[in-house]
């Protein structure tokens, strides 16, 4: 009472007047309610989910006390690994413990994508076991790291990449490498996935590399930073196919494609946004990294080439038989990292301390991005921890890089210095049965 009394005596007692008391009481009630409604409206409109986890019941209290990795492999299994506190353990490289496994993605999982505040996981099955169809499966990502199957639908053969797009991320676009197609899906209710569009592509004649370019081979489906366009690198057709997200519905409107060098085989795309927007394309057959400055119109997007080099930088040789694969831009947009497969030029100590045999490794190539020009400056080359780094990812803080090593059946975790952008030592790993195809963080 002392503190309250002192404040009342110093300010005067407003509650002696009934009208003033009513006004103050009303404000005490109305203001918190107004702020709560404003908070809910903001998140509902801008984040694509209802407050308090009311979207289909999949988002309720989705707050993770631990961090996980989801790993897909051609064994037909998606494995959850616990990565909590890896950087704090120090000392020897940590073996990541498996939390759970699921075979709900079918025989040959090729891609994983998180959605809806990381509460949903989509998995693509490439369909390599029967060679007829692929599939798209949805899972609820539980707080303990386990995955609960929600739905699975048959797709065109050979899906290898997917991204959420459109209003609240309620649509999914899928690139089908083996099926020469692009498909879109309504995932407003991830337990009832339904098709929107399927577009199949054809080639008039094989490309300069006929063994790999006998047909169109869309290898990725990437949403641009504005959320208005979808870019699809087609390895077989030497094109970046361009689509506008339809304002009137969930479909995509095809625009004119961006042609790349004949025989180069574009594989994956990454964007960097600072003062300008830059798009970087890694080509698998040409083993190049090509940069473009991006310009936007009302319903159009244009590209001006501003950079081209081999995957090891300007005037650097690429080993014969190499195959560039993944490209990722750091969360702060300052660095670009790419992986190259089948080089076999580096070595790392064996992760098993009882085994003295070194492990042959492919590289990760680290570039610094010039924010004004978009040019790339070679920053670092490091071993990635094994062979055939098909895919890798960076955590949200930019402190860890996780690499999926397809030929070694291994996932490795590397430290990364956010300030310098340098990749550091290995801090964790896990042996995973089958060819590892994809890995994603859930933090």
Enumerate the language-model features and the residues they cover.
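Short coil/turn segments that connect the beta-strands within blades of beta-propeller domains
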Residues: 66-67, 117-119, 167-170, 226-228, ...
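Short loop/turn segments immediately following the C-termini of beta-strands
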Residues: 73-74, 126-128, 177-178, 187, ...
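Short loop/turn segments immediately following beta-strands, especially the blade-tip
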Residues: 81-93, 138-145, 185-194, 243-251, ...
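Loop/turn-rich, solvent-exposed surfaces of beta-rich toroidal or solenoidal domains
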Residues: 321-405
């Amino acid at each position: 009472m002392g503190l309250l009394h002192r404040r009342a005596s110093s300010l005067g007692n407003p509650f002696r007047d009934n009208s003033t008391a009513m006004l103050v009481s009303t404000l005490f009630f109305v203001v918190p309610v107004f702020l709560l409604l404003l908070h809910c409206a903001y998140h509902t409109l801008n984040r694509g989910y209802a407050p308090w986890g009311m979207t289909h019941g999949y988002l309720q209290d989705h707050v993770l006390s631990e961090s996980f990795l989801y790993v897909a492999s051609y064994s037909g299994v998606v494995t959850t690994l616990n990565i909590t506190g890896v950087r704090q353990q120090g000392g020897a490289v940590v073996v990541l413990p498996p939390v759970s496994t699921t075979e709900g993605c079918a025989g040959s999982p090729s891609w994983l994508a998180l959605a809806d505040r990381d509460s949903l996981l989509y998995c693509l099955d490439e369909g390599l076991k029967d060679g007829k169809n692929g599939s798209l499966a949805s899972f609820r990502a539980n707080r303990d790291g386990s995955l609960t199957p929600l739905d699975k639908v048959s797709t065109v053969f050979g899906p290898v990449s997917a991204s959420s797009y459109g209003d609240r991320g309620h649509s999914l676009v899928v690139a089908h490498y083996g099926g020469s197609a692009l498909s879109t899906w309504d995932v407003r209710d991830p337990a009832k996935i339904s098709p929107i569009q399927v577009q199949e592509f054809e080639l008039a004649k094989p490309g300069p590399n006929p063994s790999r370019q006998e047909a169109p081979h869309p290898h990725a489906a990437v949403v641009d930073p504005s959320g208005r366009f979808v870019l699809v690198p087609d390895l077989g057709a030497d094109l970046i196919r361009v689509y506008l997200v339809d304002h009137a519905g969930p479909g995509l409107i095809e625009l004119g494609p961006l042609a790349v060098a004949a025989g180069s085989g574009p594989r994956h795309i990454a964007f960097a946004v600072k003062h300008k927007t830059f798009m970087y394309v890694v080509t698998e057959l040409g083993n190049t990294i090509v940069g473009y400055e991006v310009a936007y119109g009302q319903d159009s997007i244009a590209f001006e080439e501003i950079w081209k080099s081999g995957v090891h930088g300007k005037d650097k040789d690429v080993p014969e038989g190499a195959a560039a694969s993944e490209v990722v831009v750091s969360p702060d947009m300052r660095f670009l990292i790419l992986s190259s497969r089948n080089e076999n030029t580096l070595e790392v100590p064996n992760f098993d301390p009882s085994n003295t045999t070194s492990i042959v490794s492919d590289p990760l190539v680290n570039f610094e991005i010039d924010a004004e020009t978009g040019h790339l400056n070679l920053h670092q080359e490091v071993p990635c921890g094994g062979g055939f780094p098909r895919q890798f990812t960076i955590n949200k803080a930019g402190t860890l890089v996780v690499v999926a090593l397809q030929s070694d059946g291994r996932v490795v975790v590397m430290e990364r210095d956010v300030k310098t952008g340098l990749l550091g030592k290995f801090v964790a790993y896990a042996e995973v049965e089958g060819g590892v195809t994809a890995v994603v963080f859930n933090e």
